[in-house]
């Protein structure tokens, strides 16, 4: 909560939080997101009901996609291998091509963001990969532009940035806790 509040200067349109328990059932990701400031969307009663030892959050100022609740992040997808949540900062220059590839294979989009295109590609690659890390790497190789991603499966947290570091991704560690931030 406080980390998202600290990053709110980079986006005050919407925010959200997704959490998972690594000892829980496969695919058990709780999330809450909406339009508004962190203090308005992630109220104490909402946060109190979310339990997990993994989590990702996001504050948004739209550069692509409309300013609607559906576009708030993190995006959470359920698919045949479980659930994944994705928080994305950046802009892709090949979104139309990546989206068209998915549409031709039957994808139905619920947002107008390039973030959903990325999440669908990760899920699609995961179906044919041994690990979620492998799926993320395969997807990252397709992306063109500046981006930082934090992706959460029910038991793993993965951070990736564009090869040139146009969008920074910071890693912090304290004791056995890791923190990723694209700021």
Identify the residue ranges that each predicted region occupies:
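Conserved short alpha-helical segments that host acidic/polar catalytic motifs at enzyme active sites
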Residues: 1-183
């Amino acid at each position: 909560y406080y980390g998202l509040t600290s990053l709110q200067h980079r986006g005050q349109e919407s925010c959200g939080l997704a959490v998972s328990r690594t000892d829980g059932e496969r695919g058990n990701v709780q999330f809450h997101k909406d339009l508004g400031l962190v203090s308005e969307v992630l109220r104490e009663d909402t946060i109190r009901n979310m339990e997990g030892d993994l989590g990702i959050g996001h504050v948004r100022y739209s550069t692509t996609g409309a300013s609607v609740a559906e576009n708030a992040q993190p995006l959470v997808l359920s698919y045949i291998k479980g659930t994944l949540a994705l928080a994305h900062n950046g802009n892709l220059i090949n979104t139309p091509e990546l989206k068209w590839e998915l549409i031709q294979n039957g994808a139905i989009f619920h947002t107008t963001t390039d973030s959903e295109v990325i999440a669908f590609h990760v899920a699609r690659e995961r179906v044919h990969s041994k690990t979620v890390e492998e799926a993320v790497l395969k997807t990252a190789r397709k992306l063109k532009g500046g981006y930082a991603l934090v992706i959460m499966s029910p038991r793993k947290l993965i951070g990736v940035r564009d090869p040139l570091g146009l969008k920074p991704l910071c890693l912090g560690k304290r004791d056995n806790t890791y923190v990723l931030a694209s700021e």
